[in-house]
């Protein structure tokens, strides 16, 4: 760093289907590339997992980390206007949730979002229905959403819990993502990007 508030700040959220994972996973994530290529400062929150605490614990923990970054730009050496959010799998879903929360609460003007193969939809889409992948599949997906949303009334799942339910994505930051065509999250990722583009957001 050459001075205070001079590099990109990245809130990077680990994956694990909302039920597993740890903040140290950041060391094997795409966030490492952002550090190497751009000298970014990365904050990786250790959010509460759904096995212990269901929604909204994880989303609020990650949002709190975002607010921490905003309030500590000088100590972190990051630019207030260059805070981005990213994550993989459930971390990608939480990335989208945090972007919605920041917009609605008018708290942080997030510069960019990078939800990679994000877990966005608690309802089966074409790619998550009858998926028999080894790492993640329909059965694991159902269990994870059941644990994450327990206590949330059926039919009243908020967009902060499952961002695919968001009716309005206007005002969200530009986005970059990727997803494999055999992954359970393939269709919901495409739908999210299509929704952003329809709202005039570069994605």
Residue spans of the language-model regions?
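Alpha/beta-hydrolase superfamily serine-hydrolase fold, recognizing
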Residues: 2-203
